[in-house]
Amino acid sequence: MPIFTLNTNIKATDVPSDFLSSTSALVGNILSKPGSYVAVHINTDQQLSFGGSTKPAAFGTLMSIGGIEPSRNRDHSAKLFDHLNKKLGIPKNRMYIHFVNLNGDDVGWNGTTF
């Protein structure tokens, strides 16, 4: 049930048409989760400042039940930053990604919890 949320000040018109599908595939791959459980949400056109500048930037959160752990987050970070830089043109030094490991009992789905 990975959820990747990205807040960015880039315009919606600058997001490639395949961004959601390619990001979903990447998240499923790096976390070894089925694509049918992956959710991706991008909030564009945000009023956002990074380092005192409003040049292109982003703040993201990757949440998952499992797969998020200190020994793997550096690799997750490298792959996500490469992807976001390539797809959206945001410099790697103008993004933060917060990794959150969730307990299945704290996540609702289909009328129950995991």
Curated annotation (Swiss-Prot):
Pfam families: MIF
Tree of life domain: Eukaryota
InterPro entries cross-referenced by the UniProt entry: Macrophage_inhib_fac, Tautomerase/MIF_sf
Protein name, per record: Macrophage migration inhibitory factor homolog
EC number: 5.3.2.1, 5.3.3.12
Cellular location(s): Secreted
Gene Ontology CC, one term: extracellular space
Organism: Trichinella spiralis
Assigned protein family: Belongs to the MIF family.
